[in-house]
Amino acid sequence: MKHFSKGDKDMAFTGKATYSAGANLPELAEDVADLIGIVSPYETPLLDALGDPLREATSTHHEWLEDELLPNKDAVNDSTFTDPDIDTQFVVDNGSRFRVGDQIQIEGSRELMLVMGVNGNSLTVSRGYGGTLPESLADNQVINILGNAALEGDDKPGIRFTNRSRRGNYTQIFTATVEVSGTDIAASHLGLADEMDYQKQERLRELIRDLENTVINGGQPSASPQGGDTARRTMKGVVQHLATNVFRTGDSDFPTGADLDEAKINYALRKIWASSNGNVDLIVVGGFQKRKINSFLSASRSYAGSDTKFTDMVNVYESDFGVCRIVTTRWLPQDTVLLLDSSRIAVLPLAGRSFYFKPLASSGDYECGELIGEYTVELKNEAAHGIIRGLSVS
């Protein structure tokens, strides 16, 4: 048996190694993963939640009709009462909403009144109707019109109706060019089989990402919205459509504080429910507000001794005014929450203009083409949706 001395054991290795030919390892075969990682976000959660449309737009100006029932609310518009406890005449905002025989009631009051006469915006009423006790009237009080009582054998009442309104939005063209040299197409690549196909996929991801961003935040020019030689035609996004149910932190009656909490969500849902037949089923938020929604359960969360999984996530919010799926998107402003009725929203392609690739003639040693898509947003009955703005983001 050979024995080594202490000096033999300390001898450095001097033979051939993987690094002998240089730091770039020129003698070794490359080991490159045959997959390409994409770090940029391209998910479109709102488009996924809305789903594919059942129809297409057939014009660059897509239109739809909206209607509403005759209103059953109004307000007192009179500050000159002689005795607000017994006066039988007062002025309202819209006298045309009332008919003789209407039972009416001031919101928050138990007194019933019967309309005896309507003259322009002036009402004559019978106070304390049905054995109720008269209560004080005041300017700006909301009046609920309960319903009309007709006389037996009476002639038909005057005709009343609503006019349908036409709403619309313009289509917007989304494009991207793909161009690859003949040599690049012929060469062998890591992670892909065809450079042209790969470039199409990447540009398509970008266009769909931009479509969702525009569906949420896009705006429409006040001049030449139909487009022109130098005017680009753009769609109006969801945020820009909303005007009725816009809630901001600091508004009167809106729950105090800048942080998102259940009180603010429920206030907005209740207001939308009270003023429309909208069925809000989507709550759309950014990442920061999603964490705020998750915290709604912090105080009531509990775990059994056998639980080994910690869950801190809310995907569905069930309220008295609807069951809402929580959708988290990167493209919504972080201080904003959208409350949407998905049955009234559609993202429509112009007929034959869903995203597609159009090969273009090549004038050299390359292949080229263009990805094209033309879309618009149909948002019906904007009063059936809502938005909360100005929330804290830190």
Give residue spans per PLM region:
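Autoprocessing Asn-cyclization modules and mimics
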Residues: 14-135
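Glycine-centered loop/turn motifs
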Residues: 82-89, 101, 137-144, 153-155, ...
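Alpha-helical scaffold segments that mediate packing/assembly in large oligomeric complexes
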Residues: 162-264
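Intrinsically disordered or highly flexible coil/loop and linker segments, enriched in small
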Residues: 209-220, 278, 302, 306, ...
